[in-house]
Regions:
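Conserved cytochrome P450 K-helix/beta-meander segment immediately N-terminal to the heme-binding cysteine loop
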Residues: 92-121, 197
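Flexible loop/turn segments at secondary-structure boundaries
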Residues: 69, 77, 98-100, 118-119, ...
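Extracellular trypsin-like serine protease catalytic domains
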Residues: 129-132
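Cytochrome P450 catalytic-core helices
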Residues: 6-31, 142-160
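Cytochrome P450 proximal C-terminal region
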Residues: 33-41, 138, 143-198
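Cytochrome P450 I-helix active-site segment
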Residues: 16-66, 73, 80-89, 105-111, ...
Length: 198
């Protein structure tokens, strides 16, 4: 997320998912109204923005910006009967792992609430959630990316609601990052709660 394209993709898929799940969007707005009371969010608010963090975690579970991660084998290794020789390129895919029913209940559903019982750290330690990669080559900007993502969502959602343009086609375009093939046109609406405070 720390790079501009990964951040843009994470936010794009987050707004798309929120536009399709009004109950989650309402819960996000309720948290922001309670914690922020109309003001601009600050870093000190992040510990209280638990559902906002859960929305971001769940969006990156379903649509990880880095959908495939490659590693070159240094030493011969047996992967359950498949022997990888030095120099072999191994690809892991957060996109595939994050949708695996062996590890996730209702894996194709957008359920930010799942992060109320499973922490990002726990899922990362179990190697079932890795939108930032893993091991010693894990994304150096991960901490910044979480801060940036949570604050972006909170800043926009405290005032605005986004809805998908009626004719918007949704199709994945997995290149280096996972982006929407036809862009993501959305309509922006001022939230009633914000208008009443203004």
């Amino acid at each position: 997320l720390a790079g501009h394209e990964t951040t843009a993709n994470a936010m794009t898929w987050t707004w798309y998912l929120l536009s399709q799940h009004p109950a989650a969007e309402a819960k996000l707005h309720a948290e922001l109204d309670s914690v922020l009371d109309g003001r601009v969010p600050a870093i000190g608010d992040i510990p209280q923005l638990k559902f906002t963090e859960a929305v971001l975690a769940e969006a990156m579970r379903l649509y990880p910006p880095a959908w495939a991660i490659g590693r070159n084998v240094v030493d011969e290794h047996d992967f359950g009967g498949f022997v990888a020789k030095p120099g072999t390129l191994i690809l892991t895919s957060p996109f595939v792992m994050h949708r695996d029913a062996r590890f996730w209940e209702a894996p194709l559903e957008f359920r930010p609430e799942r992060w109320e019982t499973t922490s990002v750290k726990e899922a990362t330690n179990r190697n079932i959630y890795f939108p930032f990669g893993g091991g010693i080559r894990r994304c150096i900007g991960e901490s910044f990316a979480w801060t940036e993502g949570i604050l972006l969502i909170a800043t926009i959602a405290r005032k605005w609601k986004l809805s998908l343009a009626p004719d918007q086609r949704i199709c994945l375009n997995p290149q280096i990052t996972l982006r929407p093939k036809f862009g993501m046109r959305m309509k922006i609406h001022a939230r009633k709660a914000w208008i009443e405070k203004a």
